[in-house]
A protein has these predicted regions:
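Active-site recognition of the HExxH zinc-binding catalytic motif
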Residues: 34-46, 76
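Short pre-active-site segment immediately N-terminal to the catalytic Zn-binding motif
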Residues: 11-12, 18-36
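Generic alpha-helical propensity signal that fires on short helical segments
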Residues: 30, 37-39, 59-61
Length: 82
């Protein structure tokens, strides 16, 4: 579902402190520093907000503003550049 929504073949999704990969090898994911930084930011967000509260906030943001303008995604994209 995430791959279709993002129009991407390869997807990484964080739940708690685990990064779940779809159609990408662990090696290729780890070699992409921007993608890794993005997902590590989501791990930090889960830690800061708590597991269930983060999911609720993330879903609410996505419903209100869409995926691209979701503040958690904006923050994760900014983390890619650090």
């Amino acid at each position: 579902m995430a791959a279709v929504k993002l129009k991407s073949h390869s997807v990484a999704m964080v739940l708690g402190k685990t990064i779940h990969l779809h159609n990408v090898s662990k090696e290729n994911f780890l070699n992409d520093s921007q993608w890794l930084k993005h997902e590590l930011c989501h791990i930090r967000q889960f830690k800061e907000h708590g597991y269930f509260l983060f999911i609720a906030k993330y879903l609410w943001e996505s419903l209100r503003k869409g995926y691209y303008n979701n503040r958690f995604e904006v923050e994760a994209r900014a983390a890619e550049k650090l």
